[in-house]
Design a protein with these regions (language model features):
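Non-membrane alpha-helical structural segments and their capping/turn regions in soluble enzymes
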Residues: 96-101, 186, 218-221, 225
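Hydrophobic "anchor" residues on beta-strands that sit immediately upstream
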Residues: 23-24, 80
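C-terminal domain-boundary segment and adjacent tail
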Residues: 2-16, 48-52, 58, 111, ...
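DG-centered beta-turn motif at the end of beta-strands
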Residues: 24-29, 182
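Metal-dependent polysaccharide deacetylase catalytic core of the NodB/CE4 family, i.e.
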Residues: 42-143, 147-160, 166-175, 199-211, ...
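A Trp-anchored, charged/polar loop motif used as the substrate-binding/catalytic surface
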Residues: 180-191
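Short amphipathic alpha-helical segments and helix-helix/interface helices
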Residues: 35-38, 68-72, 133-137, 190-193, ...
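Short acidic, Gly/Ser-rich segments with clustered Asp/Glu that frequently serve as metal-coordination loops
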Residues: 29-35
């Protein structure tokens, strides 16, 4: 299996990180990724990463979760498909071999449907330990997105988190500046964007719009459109996680901070 290269060639240089650089990510393969989120982002010209797992009720409830054919269509529309593991198991409870097997399963499912092998990863429930970092490094992932902890207190219904500072954070523990849900509002989104300056990047972790099976991370379509309108009105550069490679050299990891949670 080979990963598609969305980075820079040896003759290219990294682009300067613009202020208001925002990364959009969506976890769990909710049906709204295909029916609502993807079409809206396409109209706005925004990039995004959709992290896919076959855990939760993905295999049994196609009213609330995307099909692999729909995932392929999201890829065809230019969005990134990232790896969220086979079973959505907390990575800090798995051995390296167990996590690698979960990662490879999603890789193979992507290949079966003509989707590039993922080069980015989203930690299920933000849980991570040393063996998870080792597994991702061994598999050649460029970037892995985590949640808001341990820097910010965990709230099951969303909240603020640290902005990503490439000079500080290891690329396999990219923090979320916000996890929208019932405990997260418009002022929190504005706060995240305002932190995205001086080389720092706001990474946002969404789930379903709406998240029918998981109301604790639900965002309504009306809320979501308000958020996206703000990003557009404020001339934000909105990208997928893989596109960080245009601005950040993921191979430079010496001295970068790695945090585990919980």
């Amino acid at each position: 299996m080979e990963k598609e290269n969305h980075g820079l060639s040896e003759t290219e240089i990294l682009q300067p990180i613009p202020d208001r650089l925002v990364v959009l990510t969506f976890d769990d393969g909710n049906k709204s990724d295909y029916t609502y989120v993807g079409p809206l982002l396409k109209r706005y010209g925004f990039g995004a990463t959709f992290f896919i797992t076959e855990g939760l009720n993905f295999l049994n409830n196609k009213a609330h979760y995307v099909t692999w054919e729909e995932i392929r269509q999201l890829h065809d529309e230019g969005f990134e498909i990232g790896n969220h593991t086979r079973h959505h198991t907390h990575a800090n409870t798995q051995s390296k071999a167990e996590l690698l097997a979960d990662l490879i399963h999603i890789d193979e499912r992507c290949e079966e449907h003509g989707i590039p092998v993922p080069e980015t990863f989203g930690y299920p429930a933000d849980c991570r330990g040393p063996e998870a970092i080792e597994a991702l490094s061994e598999k050649g992932y460029r970037f892995a997105r985590r949640g808001i902890g341990p820097e910010f207190p965990f709230h099951p219904e969303g909240g603020r988190g640290p902005v990503y500072d490439p000079d500080v954070h290891h690329p396999l523990v990219v923090p979320s500046a916000g996890v929208p849900g019932p405990n997260y509002g418009f002022e929190d989104l504005v706060w995240a964007v305002e932190q995205a300056k001086d080389g720092k990047i706001a990474v946002l972790t969404f789930h379903g719009v709406p998240a029918v099976e998981h109301p604790w991370v639900n965002v309504s379509p009306e809320q979501f459109e308000t958020y996206m309108n703000y990003l557009r009105a404020n001339a934000c550069t909105v990208i997928a996680l893989r596109d960080l490679a245009k601005y950040v050299d993921a191979s430079e990891t010496a001295g970068k901070s790695i945090t585990y949670w919980p």
